[in-house]
Amino acid sequence: MRTLIGADQRTSGKIILKGKEVKNGWNTTKALKAGIGLLPEDRKTQGFMNLSNNYENIAISSLEKYMTGPFTDTKKKIKNAEVYFEEMDVHPRRVDYMTSNMSGGNQQKVILARWMSTDVDIIIFDEPTKGVDVGAKAEIYRLMEQLVEDGKSIIVVSSELPEAMGIS
C-alpha cells in the first residue's frame, strides 16, 4: 500500500493510475497531487507527526490552503480542524491536543480528516480499525460510506474477515 502512495519504491510490477503507467520517481508528493491518500496500518509511526497537535496533523498534507505569504494561517488550520472534529465526533474536541495522546480510534479520525481536508479522490484504508474500539469502528465505517457517497474511491485492506465482508 505504501508503494501506491510513493512512500516505498516499487521493486516489480506496474502501477496504472487513470489509464497511465506511473513511471520511476513516483513519490508521496506526486501521489498527493494525483489525489491518493493513505490511512496506514501503523498509524503511530506512519500516520501522523508524533510531536504535533491535531490541527497541524490535519493540515500537513494541504499546507498551500493555509498559506498567507511565507507563513501558514494558524487560525484557519484550527477552524478547519474544528469542522472535522465536529463532523467525525472526535474526542476530546481539542484541536490543540497532541495527536499521540489520543485514543487509537481518534488518531485514525485525525488521519482521515487530513485526507478529507486535502480532497483526495482515492483513499487507501490499510487495516483501518486495527486497535480501535467498537464505537470508533462504527464511526470509521460510517465515514467510509460517506466518502463513497461523495464520489470518492476507497481501497480497504483488512485481515479481519467479518470487516472485509461487511465493507464489501
Predicted feature locations:
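Glycine-rich phosphate-binding loops of nucleotide-dependent enzymes
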Residues: 1-168
